Amino acid sequence: MKRRDLIKTLTLLPLAGSFPIDSLFATPVAGNNVPFNMQNKPMPDLHRKAFVMDGHTHVMTRELLMGTDIGQRYTDGNVDLPRAKEGGVDAMFFSVYTPEHYYPGRFETKNTFRVVNLALDQIKKNHSQIELALNASDIQRINKKGKMAAFLDLEGPWDMDGDINLLRALHRLGLRSIQLPAHNTTNAFIDTCNDVSRWGGINDLGRKIIREMNELGMVINIAHASNDAILQSVEASKHPLIYSHGGFYGIVPHPRCITDEAAKSLAAKGGVIGIHFGSLFNNPIYWKWQQGQKKSNETKPGTVQAAPLKTIEEVDKEVLKEVPLSFRGTIPEEYWMHVDQLAKVIDYGVQLVGEDHMALGSDLDGGPELPREIKDISDYPQMTMAMQRLGYSDTRIKKILGLNWLRVIREVTGN
């Protein structure tokens, strides 16, 4: 089937300058003395009763390439439904991910649709544990049943050219959130943070896509976008946007981290920032060491842009070598972050933009160098306890754990 015929068919488908940055890692943290027992994991009553939602988890790459089942407990990786239940996680932005490997051969559209289809199949297969959510009311209804609510979020391009007909087809399939950037590669309408600037932010096509997503009631995710692209996307949208997973540039000057300027702009529009769980974006000591090693923990444009492989199956074999996704390698003991240090990053955001605009976007199974107290999603209560040690009120913690995500979804998608 020709590309244009495929498209036609698919469209017919029913500045925190006052914050003491140095204090993040210059003094001992409570985490150094926290009892740590992976077999006897504590869960505060607050965490058990709260609505908990993760803004970014990689959950389908393994299932696509290895034929596994998210409803079963894995012996490796970070995320599956049994462990999510143990961690008290009620809902997740399920990342439907297309990595850069698929771009040279222009397989990004095919991969996107097959991963979305797989996600729907996995949800149906495990219907006793999980349901697809299209809006905030769905999430709350599913949560009351004691099931996981899956809110699909696209990471990577549905089409490098930004075909709006394909966007509409994905909406009909149940996709309600899309990251505008093509991961770390600039596409036809928006600049990414790790690639060359082609558009000075976003272009007219990017603004047209934003208007379309506003009309469809789709959440606009600007993680991986350049600073100018974030600012311009916020200005172009009539709805709040999200930055699903990352850190603050004011703490770690990694291009993937959001600047204070962009964070304030996003919050002023009602948006939410999800804090990534990895050391690379949150631990300045680790960042300096990693820079000294002259290694990168992020896929760079060009590293997978060599001669394209002939078939999508050949690309699958290359991606499979990296599953479960991991960029962390070996972390020297002195650079291994504690969960209390991650909580201080959250507090940086609270001081900068307020408690109504902060949340969690772990990137579990996406490769982060996790804090030493967090092995997988079952350890999510560690985040609640770390925020309690900061002296946060129950109300503030509940917002950060999930209510802020729920608010944005309600405002964007309606009921």
Give the role of each language-model region.
Residues 163-167, 226-238:
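Distinct, well-ordered alpha-helical segments
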Residues 211-222, 228-232, 262-268:
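Substrate-binding cleft of carbohydrate-active enzyme catalytic domains
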Residues 222-223, 245:
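Short His-Asn-centered micro-motif
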Residues 240-246:
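Short hydrophobic/aromatic-enriched beta-strand-loop microsegments
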